[in-house]
């Protein structure tokens, strides 16, 4: 019935993804600053004028829970917003969600989305 879509993307692509998701009608998103590495290994970073080696790269994680019927469209929206063809474009993970509960009202599933 529901799936959770997690997209790890470059931070500067967040605004474009957010606008496209909201235009599609996604009712809400969770955004978290994360760090990680994969094929795109870190390099020289600067902070307050000091250079240092960084094995982890700053990314942004977007999480949304939607009805399964919308997953393919949302994946396409995200890919179209962030794709450069370069290492580091990110990853999308899709997981099943068995139930959703809004704490304030105790609404469940579709009423809680």
From Swiss-Prot:
Entries under InterPro entries matching the protein: N-reg_PII, N-reg_PII-like_a/b, N-reg_PII/ATP_PRibTrfase_C, N-reg_PII_CS
Pfam families: P-II (PF00543)
Keyword RNA-binding in annotation: no
Annotated PROSITE patterns: PII_GLNB_CTER (PS00638), PII_GLNB_DOM (PS51343)
The keyword Chloroplast is annotated on this UniProt entry: yes
Keywords recorded for this protein, A-Z: Chloroplast, Nucleotide-binding, Phosphoprotein, Plastid, Transcription, Transcription regulation
Residues with PTM O-UMP-tyrosine: 52
A GO term from the CC aspect: chloroplast
Subcellular location(s) per record: Plastid, Chloroplast
Single GO molecular function: ATP binding
UniProt-listed GO biological process terms: regulation of nitrogen utilization
Assembly and binders: Homotrimer.
Family per similarity comment: Belongs to the P(II) protein family.
Function: P-II indirectly controls the transcription of the glutamine synthetase gene (glnA). P-II prevents NR-II-catalyzed conversion of NR-I to NR-I-phosphate, the transcriptional activator of glnA. When P-II is uridylylated to P-II-UMP, these events are reversed. When the ratio of Gln to 2-ketoglutarate decreases, P-II is uridylylated to P-II-UMP, which causes the deadenylation of glutamine synthetase, so activating the enzyme.
The protein's name in its UniProt record: Nitrogen regulatory protein P-II
């Amino acid at each position: 019935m529901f799936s959770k879509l997690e997209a790890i993307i470059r931070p500067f692509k967040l605004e474009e993804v957010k606008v496209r998701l909201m235009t599609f009608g996604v009712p809400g998103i969770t955004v978290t600053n994360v760090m990680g590495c994969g094929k795109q290994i870190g390099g020289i970073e600067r902070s307050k004028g000091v250079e240092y080696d960084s094995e982890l790269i700053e990314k942004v994680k977007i999480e949304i829970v939607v009805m399964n019927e919308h997953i393919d469209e949302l994946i396409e929206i995200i890919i179209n917003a962030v794709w450069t063809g370069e290492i580091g474009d990110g990853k999308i993970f899709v997981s099943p969600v068995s139930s959703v509960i809004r704490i304030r009202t105790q609404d469940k599933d579709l009423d809680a989305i």
